[in-house]
Amino acid sequence: MPLPSSQNSSSPGVKRKQSTLASFFTKKPQTAQQASVNVVEEKSPAATFDKADNQERAAKKDKALTDDEEDDIVAPAPKRVRTNGLYPASREEIPNSTSTTERPPALTSSQRTERFKFSSSPAVNTGVEGSQAAVELEAGQRQKEREELHHKFVRKLGGADCLIGIGRNAISEATPEEGAEPEDEEEAAPPPPAKGKAAAKKGGSKLTPMEKQVIDIKRKHMDTVLVVEVGYKFRFFGEDARVAAKELSIVCIPGKLRFDEHPSEASHLDRFASASIPVHRLHVHVKRLVAAGHKVGVVRQIETAALKAAGDNRNAPFVRKLTNLYTKGTYIDDAEGLGGPMPAASGGASPATGYLLCITETNAKGWGNDEKVQVGIVAVQPATGDIVYDDFEDGFMRSEIETRLLHIAPCELLIVGELSKATEKLVQHLSGSKLNVFGDKTRVERVLKSKTAAAESHSHVSSFYAGKMKTASAADDAQASSLLQKVLNLPEQVTICLSSMIEHMKEYGLEYVFELTKYFQHFSSRSHMLLNGNTLMSLEIYQNQTDHTTKGSLFWTLDRTQTRFGQRMLRKWVGRPLLDKSRLEERVNAVEELKNPEKTVMVERLKGLLGKVKSDLEKSLIRIYYGKCTRPELLTVLQTMQMIAQEFSDVKSPADTGFASTAINEAITCLPTILEDVVAFLDKINMHAAKSDDKYAFFREAEETEDISDQKLGIASVEHELEEHRSVAGQKLGKKTVEYKSVAGIDYLIEVENSSASIKRVPASWVKVSGTKKVSRFHTPEVIQLMRQRDQHKEALAAACDQAFISLLADIATKYQPFRDSVQALATLDCLIALATIASQPGYVKPEYTDHTCIQVDQGRHPMVEQLLLDSYVPNDIDLDSDKTRALLVTGPNMGGKSSYVRQVALIAIMGQIGSYVPAQSAKLGMLDAVFTRMGAFDNMLAGESTFMVELSETADILKQATPRSLVILDELGRGTSTHDGVAIAQAVLDYMVRSIRSLTLFITHYQHLSSMVHSFADQELRNVHMRFTESGTGTDEEITFLYEVGEGVAHRSYGLNVARLANLPGALLDQARQKSKELEEKIRRRKLAGLVTAVGEVIEGSKDENMIERLISSAEQL
């Protein structure tokens, strides 16, 4: 029956509902009509609307309306109409229902205010309540029917998470109902189920079980970026997601960043921000985060789907735990580490040492301020097991701390307790910037230090090593006991650091590294030359001063190693030149023998062996010791060590090596000693399974544990039952047997053709898994049950295989020391061959060593500049002797090569004591105990110290530490103040160095006045030398040619204007400077001439001054 209101569908008081798909599932917002429409509503449409309502109610008694697709008229819901007019009191009050729309007269302000009323207002006429109730009842019934239709439609589509459900939510959120009260029916409707993190209700604090897990772990590790395993991905949540997105360049889905219910986010965000990475890329992304300086934690699911399904907590979320923590220093889960593959010898990257350094300090006894402090350090390299410790007193310049930080170059610092201001500023300076001297930003962590830290630390360290002493084997008992006793007797500050470091490393599961007491080493053991921090930077030992990479450094020049562990050993050699003459001669003799053409065959054999070593054995061994090694890596390590040991299996004694050098013989003899143990471990492993990382077949059958065998038998039994079940399934289909199919990774599918008669015989209990137009694939109930049993056996087998592998690693770890010794022996051979390669270059000579302190070099060259220059380097001689000329006063023009010359002398001395050949025609070197440099000018703004203050402070440190066996280089001391003060200080320091300390000294200056000091040394302890040059032309055409040769005497001019011209300063400025320079020179010359005339007069008058004649001669030469 057509609706009565169809004729008046165009009436202004009603709206026709559109017949669209959205009408099924979108609740139409019932908004109030505009004032102009409501106020002018006519009687005729209203009467028609009432009539239609009455007819509809009569019709519904006979037939319920079930289809909402027909056109029906919907009046605006007048539940709580807020208009600028009020409801008509009754229908009679509406004038002329048939008249056309008339505009009412304009209302005054008071009238508008009076008529602005709601239906609930007491002023409203209650006569309208009857018709109002009828309208509300009709609207309610219509809404209820629409809701029923909507829920049917949603159920048919498949839930609120389908596309249309999402669309409905979007529409309803985009068009909220304004001014109307919420419908009771809508509130009563059950909310659609949400998935994952979306379960957190908007404006509420309800969290999913997995989110609760993440928050619980995060609260314990607030300083850690957590990577959480969720199914087939690893995910970051909250603030961690933002950090990961920035560092890894991945997408971050917006959401809450904070892990607390903070009002700023909780009110309008219902889930955490998140980012994700694939499982197989975990190690790549973790390495990038760690290299960026973050502390990263990996949270894994520690139960599998099959075991979870069989367990009691099948309905609970997966159990997750923090399984791994990584920082720069503790990242050892990758054989290559953070440094990546072995760089080329000419590469520019700085090799990371990977040291964690713990430091603590206290005021020195008798000092109440921070001027003198007692410092303790412990540095550990988890990737190799090396441990360095020291206890020392430091002055207000903190030069001792700086020296150790630059030598060790830690990638992480652990600070125990509060540091003094001076130390704190030094640490910030060395570790704060991206381009610091360590080559990268250093991670800094801090722990508190209690007042009773010393006693607590000693107790903690003692208990840590107590178990170690009990388990020491009889063979190693004496050595282990002595080493452990040495550890327990460490100084107080070192013990505090050691205790803190043990506790710190427990967090990463690496505390076992401290059980390797054999590798404890004292930093300040005076078995090597001291190179302080200033010297390391000034002489560019590890890094150049331009871009802080290794290219152009001494280490870069000497690094011809083929292995990573050999490279690390050479780095130690370069930073710690030997003081023991016998060890030094032993090393240089080994280099000489390897360089000998007669030994070419043996050397090539060694080079070939080193070339075959592709893995970093030292790091892999420590990973085995920690129990973190992978199966393919273990196979590689053992096979490589077997290859090394077998290469020299015929060597039974040092006489069998074919070399005369003791150092080479000891290294080669050490290699075959591990063969028996390595072969025994390899015999337990299935090579092909280990290569493919097949944990199930990793062990050979004879070596499998009982648990592994039981689980494999269980799997075999289940698979046998599955085979037998084929005939049972075939009988049900009317066949003798059926064949199992595997599709899309799903096994044991029974395939039935849709066109065959067998399809009608498929029992209802069979579960259809997949199908095509031609076939359908099923699982029988028996197959499902047996597959579940098989999966449980597989999971248990995987756990048993992992446990057996960990036990094998523990067995190999008991042989760590002999294996490490053999790797160290191979590293020694690598370093010696690298030095032999350097020695084979033209122009390199074997130095002669003497106990007498001297440096005598003929035609020496700068080792690094020579390699970087395309042109040939101009060689120079040097002759310093503690009994003859101990000091040289070096003068010369700017850019004349003074600094290169003095650096060349120091570098040749250092190379000689490393055990290397040196770039010269001949060299005789004494055993220097230290090289000190004071070069370059910079201020220390953080400490409020000027350039001159830094200059003099460093000079004061040198004067305290230098001995008669030291080489001291002072470059332009005194230039940071006025000329008179600068000359006075420079002269006093130089005199003190030569007369009192008696060090070998190279003193660069532009103060020609100092040249007269040579006359006060009768035995020529001090000599004047200058960098030679030639000048041509005069005035503006004057040109200087640098010869870069050292000559006797003094350079009376510095030719600074020549440098200004090379720097392209404006010509007018140069002319003015040249004029001023001439005026000043003429003025000084006149003064000298006047002094000379006076001196001549005194001589004529019969002065008895013995030095007068020499002064006259000197003055005449200067004129």
Swiss-Prot record:
One of its GO terms (cellular component) is nucleus. Pfam families: MutS_I, MutS_II, MutS_III, MutS_IV, MutS_V. It is found in: Nucleus. Residues 1-12, 25-37, 95-111 have a biased composition (Polar residues). GO terms for biological process: mismatch repair; mitotic recombination. Residues 1-20, 25-143, 174-207 are annotated as: Disordered. Keywords: ATP-binding, DNA damage, DNA repair, DNA-binding, Nucleotide-binding, Nucleus. Transmembrane segments: none annotated. ATP binds at G892, P893, N894, M895, G896, G897, K898, S899. One of its GO terms (molecular function) is ATP-dependent DNA damage sensor activity. InterPro entries: DNA_mismatch_repair_MutS-lik_N, DNA_mismatch_repair_MutS/MSH, DNA_mismatch_repair_MutS_C, DNA_mismatch_repair_MutS_clamp, DNA_mismatch_repair_MutS_core, DNA_mismatch_repair_MutS_N, DNA_mismatch_repair_MutS_sf, DNA_mmatch_repair_MutS_con_dom. Residues 201-329 are annotated as: Mispair-binding domain. Residues 175-188 have a biased composition (Acidic residues). Gene3D superfamilies: 1.10.1420.10, DNA repair protein MutS, domain I, MutS, connector domain, P-loop containing nucleotide triphosphate hydrolases. The keyword DNA repair applies. Residues 40-66 have a biased composition (Basic and acidic residues). Component of the post-replicative DNA mismatch repair system (MMR). Heterodimerizes with msh2 to form MutS beta, which binds to DNA mismatches thereby initiating DNA repair. Msh3 provides substrate-binding and substrate specificity to the complex. When bound, the MutS beta heterodimer bends the DNA helix and shields approximately 20 base pairs. Acts mainly to repair insertion-deletion loops (IDLs) from 2 to 13 nucleotides in size, but can also repair base-base and single insertion-deletion mismatches that occur during replication. Heterodimer consisting of msh2-msh3 (MutS beta). Forms a ternary complex with MutL alpha (mlh1-pms1). Belongs to the DNA mismatch repair MutS family. MSH3 subfamily. This is DNA mismatch repair protein msh3. The gene is msh3.
